[in-house]
Amino acid sequence: MAKRSNTTMTSAGLQLGREVAPPDSPETAKLDRVPNPQRDTDYLARFTVPEFTSLCPVTGQPDFAHLVIDYAPGPWLVESKSLKLYLASFRNHGAFHEDCTVAIGKRLTAEIKPKWLRIGGYWYPRGGIPIDVFWQTGRLPKGLWVPDQGVAPYRGRG
């Protein structure tokens, strides 16, 4: 395998390796991307976010979710620090569960142009009702192994 220069994988504009102020909102958050060195290979990358938070747009109460983001990278990879900051920007953002989940999937798709992406938003109950939200870009690439997202349906104390 050829040795890669560190300069080919980094850019002066990345947030990685720098002290960065948290973004004020998802709309102003910057998502960084880096070139995919395995662009010609179909593979799956997964981000698991067990402590995602946002605010109810009506009551202002906090909402909590376990997010699982699976994607088959195309030309770009999402840089994980910028993803963390982007997701943290929802902490003071008021939106319904469905909107948060789908907006994250669409934003990632627009920024990194994956071959395929899906997001599962497993929201903890509010008002006694758990809400699970699922979104994907289209058909799964042929032959791509995608494990189960591994989040059990909410059962409470049952």
Curated annotation (Swiss-Prot):
Residues 1-37 are annotated as: Disordered. GO terms for molecular function: preQ1 synthase activity. InterPro entries: GTP-CH-I_C/QueF, NADPH_dep_7-cyano-7-deazaG_red, QueF, QueF_type1. The active site is at C56 (thioimide intermediate), D63 (proton donor). The keyword Secreted does not apply. GO terms for biological process: queuosine biosynthetic process; tRNA modification. Its EC number is 1.7.1.13. Disulfide bonds: none annotated. It holds the Pfam family QueF. Pathway: tRNA modification; tRNA-queuosine biosynthesis. It catalyses: 7-aminomethyl-7-carbaguanine + 2 NADP(+) = 7-cyano-7-deazaguanine + 2 NADPH + 3 H(+). Substrate binds at V78, E79, S80, H97, E98. It is found in: Cytoplasm. One of its GO terms (cellular component) is cytoplasm. The keyword Cytoplasm applies. Keywords: Cytoplasm, NADP, Oxidoreductase, Queuosine biosynthesis. Residues 1-13 have a biased composition (Polar residues). It comes from the Bacteria. HAMAP family: QueF_type1 (MF_00818). Belongs to the GTP cyclohydrolase I family. QueF type 1 subfamily. Catalyzes the NADPH-dependent reduction of 7-cyano-7-deazaguanine (preQ0) to 7-aminomethyl-7-deazaguanine (preQ1). This is NADPH-dependent 7-cyano-7-deazaguanine reductase. It comes from Bradyrhizobium sp. (strain ORS 278).
